[in-house]
């Protein structure tokens, strides 16, 4: 009998932060004020996992473009390498070495099956309200024979 793998992200919202980030503090305050559940992940203290980074990429509408701050441009000018040219393992390594290149906060929400469904990067008072709405789960129809 196969054991079903438990997904620890199921139904959760994660706020990826750095401690000194004022936008991160605004996002946390918003979640507190609206009684929304969340888990904080400080990626300066504990690096972003490969899985979490891949989940973030899966929800990014423009690849890596919106993920990186202006500091990423400094990396481009110091090396002849563009962030867009890096492989995913190279990006993860770079982020672990220089977490300040990521925009913050990154808020990612998973459905009850543990599939990443929503993400916002940075703090925007209007856009963050999307996390107040529940995720719509697909309804399973039974077919009568």
Swiss-Prot record:
Keywords: Disulfide bond, Oxidoreductase, Redox-active center. The keyword Disulfide bond applies. GO terms for molecular function: oxidoreductase activity. The keyword Oxidoreductase applies. Disulfide bonds join 21-24. Belongs to the ArsC family. This is Uncharacterized protein MG127 homolog. It comes from Mycoplasma pneumoniae (strain ATCC 29342 / M129 / Subtype 1) (Mycoplasmoides pneumoniae). The lineage of its organism: Bacteria, Bacillati, Mycoplasmatota, Mycoplasmoidales, Mycoplasmoidaceae.
